[in-house]
Amino acid sequence: MTIKFLSESTINRIAAGEVIERPASVVKELVENAVDASSTKIDIILERAGKNLIIISDDGIGMTDKELEIAVERHTTSKFDESDFLNINTFGFRGEALPSIAAISKMLITSKKRDADKAFQIKLIGGNEKQVTISVHNEGTKIEIRDLFFATPARLKFLRADKTELAATVGVVKKIALAHPKISFSLTHDGKNLLKLKGQNKDAETNLKQRIIDVIGDDFIKNAAYIDFKTPDFSICGYTSSPTYNRASSEDQFLFINNRPVKDKLLQIALRVAYQDYLARDRYPICAIFLQINPQLVDVNVHPAKAEVRFHDPDYVRNLLIEAIKNALTNKSHVTSTTIASDALELFKNPLVNKQSPVSKVINVNSKSADYRPTTHSTLNTVPQNHVCQKLIDTLSHAKIEQEVENRIEHEQQIRKQYKLGAAKAQLHTTYIISQTEDSIVITDQHAAHKRLGYEKIKHYLKTEELIKQRLLIPEIVELPNEKKADCLYDHREKLYKLGLTLEKFGEKSIIVTEIPNILGDVNVQKLIQDLADHLSDFGKNIALTELIEHVTETYACHYSIRAGRKLSADEMNALLRQMENTLLSGQCNHGRPTYIELKLKDIERLFGR
């Protein structure tokens, strides 16, 4: 086949294929153009998720007839010149997006320059038939895209259902809206308003907070830590959720570089590392994080759609983001999710009925078979009258008891005022500690709470010094289910030795343990080794030391902690609560589950209609 030049329309269609994948891609390019045009209001109208019609209207600076004619040509832009190539502050090349979109659709652009007398219009079908005419329009630009991909039917076949395509477009608009809280946005689909976001004109932090509430929700802000971190070349701000407020996917993670939404692996890994002590591997935090970086230190042109970026010093950026998130979480370390208490109160209002074990009968306190009956006056009158001395002793003892009770009540009142988690009042099902504060009831999971305390304590030991080893009087032989698990533990024996565990191979499937960390006390060695083997066998020999330490610390903490089912005295319960108040990140266990929930008195009173 003879080599030949491609036609201009074919070149444009190929270029469009790199950038324009679906209606959401068109909306992204055109809305970013509107942002770059200094717009304060951007309206988006869609029909059939954008397959039939996309209209983007803005009140930006607009274009003259000459600019309009040039804007739809390839390799033209109003956004920068050659000297700015390493210092890009805009979101795209107006002269790149428009011809690419025009090549695969029927496009109509109407625009009026600010303070101009006339508006102009240009119409293109498949990128051809370019003709500028005089029109009527307000200041700004309106772009209509009809019959997207009509010129590339193969691409049209691969579009998803309207619902899926619409969700992608809504996601794009939300991301851009988060980055520009001063701009008003509206999104209408098939005549139905889906988004209406009012532009904010207060200080930057207030603007961002309100836009996040409008886009992500008020619950997120209530359960999020504010990030404010600065260096000479970087600044990081935004909100990231408390570990107990998490999701099953990373869909609600909004990351921005110089106000540009990105889905960058480096940033996602940094986010995962920052939360690795607080969340299970299958749970994800929610965040809206904005990194402002010297444009010369980041390349945004790595990907045609600019979804990925390249940093001059990626490790430095990664470490800064981890530090910024951890600092923010530390400041919110004792707080558990506010929605957990709300969910608990909803369960009180609408209790779940267990159909497997229905209540067999209702006990009537007046029936003969009742287990409890109120004491009658006749019973009280049966006290013998001839024990005068005993009565005197009882009275004196009673006075002493009353004084002790009063002292204890006064002490508890001080605790309720002074401490966030209040004074322990009871232990429920030998698993949950019930405590009282000035205006709430706190329910604490004793195992989850103590596990968190143990995790932080062991982690501190591992950072500052080697764990003190405790030699077993009689070495423990642990038989594992298979040779693979035994080999895995043995392969890591040198690393485990530094973590306080001394072991040797004993036969094909067994391990002999001679020393354990002193901090674990009287631990079940069999269970400890089996749990460690389960954790590590999935990773084999190639597990990194940091990851190994994470797994070992988690296993140690689990065996160190108070188990559910253990009865605690009032002093032990209060001691646990005080330790929680003095330990960072005690509001959740290291899987992101809450260690306590707080039920406000006003909410409890509402349950009773008070």
From Swiss-Prot:
One GO biological process term: mismatch repair
Keyword Ribosomal protein in record: no
Gene Ontology cellular-component terms listed: mismatch repair complex
PROSITE patterns: DNA_MISMATCH_REPAIR_1
Record bears the keyword Aminoacyl-tRNA synthetase: no
HAMAP family: DNA_mis_repair
Function field: This protein is involved in the repair of mismatches in DNA. It is required for dam-dependent methyl-directed DNA mismatch repair. May act as a 'molecular matchmaker', a protein that promotes the formation of a stable complex between two or more DNA-binding proteins in an ATP-dependent manner without itself being part of a final effector complex.
Listed name of the protein: DNA mismatch repair protein MutL
